[in-house]
Amino acid sequence: MSLAIVHSRAQVGVEAPCVSVEAHLANGLPSLTLVGLPETAVRESKDRVRSALLNAGFDFPARRITLNLAPADLPKDGGRFDLAIALGILAASGQLPGTALDGLECLGELALSGAIRPVRGVLPAALAARDARRVLVVPKENAEEASLASGLTVFAVDHLLEIAGHLSGQAPLLPYQARGLLRAPFPYPDLAEVQGQAAAKRALLVAAAGAHNLLLSGPPGTGKTLLASRLPGLLPALDEDEALEVAAIHSVASHVPLRHWPQRPFRQPHHSASAPALVGGGSRPQPGEITLAHQGVLFLDELPEFERKVLEVLREPLESGEIVIARANGRVRFPARFQLVAAMNPCPCGYLGDPSGRCRCTPEQVQRYRGKLSGPLLERIDLHVSVLRESTSLQPGHGETATAEVSERVGAARQRQLARQGCANAHLDLQAMHRNCALAEADRRWLEAAGERLELSLRALHRILKVARTLADLERIDAIERRHLAEALQYRATTST
């Protein structure tokens, strides 16, 4: 047989499109041609594969070899196709039975000795292989990650000779058995460690219950960062699909996806981060912080210290839950359904309104400082809370609400939302909002009058409605009442003061 086809997977964002590696041997002067839009690392695989085959004891065909990576319009990069190319050459030259490659996908980079090295982005490929009902061959170091795709048969190999012996029937391999030891609970910091700040804790409860974005404003040392770091522990546990989605993102980003499996991400980029670092980018697009925070929390401390153009790129993903990065050779889509928590000081020195009277900032300095945050960005933050200085006691607080107690209330509210509309309140579209956030006529007129008095936009009013819906869910009430609207409006009315 002079033609063989082996299936593999490319990496495009967090997707893994199928790539067919076609190997054809023809008569003529010995040569090896690789086509199908390969990048440098893929073109270099010709030399790696040749040395690996020879050092493993196989014959390298002295014929005219053509390798095609289809589809031709899909860019291919990295050494992930080495193993597929080697198996294709072996099958096309008759050193392996061609039928053994049916229903098989493989990933792996070859060393010159024939050893198989790990590659990144294995989990998205494993999920795609499972959907295609194929068996997956991966390097042994990637096997635990690939096994997260439940129902997929995985073969883990260290050397080219192992998979060749399996395909020839001389030394059959057993499917990899996942250890399952890396799914231990991750201890989140407890909310009870934060002393006082009842109003801020109430806002944190509302934010967790409805997946609302939150802005904490106050002097230094009042507990803004402590409060933000407690939010992931209040959120409901990830379900299997969400956990796999998060793990797939970290697999693509070269992070170990099992390190905190299956915990909600908490990302805290420095205020000097660039726009590509925040939303993703590069000649070969990689996920940024907003994608790494998918299904979790993105915490931006010292919000006005970020460059304004960096903050403005958050506006689209805050609405759509995804980010699209366009390049000359195509567009890459990354998920970005994160919960934004931001913290800021009220003025450049940080002590505006502090009882100590230490603030010496002029009104112009305060206005210029706050002017770094655009109105459209602030409108997309549902809850604006002032965190004021309280007790300075070094003794641990007693009687503080624990994370377990708050997370139980959050879980009950989220269950009501999922049963009613299939998503958290913050993610309601316009039609679903009108359907699930209906008001009595008197309450509707009251909210409209408040919006006119405070000069709120229609988007701000919609977000007030969603927060009010969350407040009603926390009380297990079906109808939104005036007091829910008043509290939701309070979080909005303190925005720009």
Give the ranges of each region predicted by the language model.
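Conserved catalytic network of the ASCE P-loop NTPase/AAA+ motor domain
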Residues: 26, 57-60, 97-99, 129-131, ...
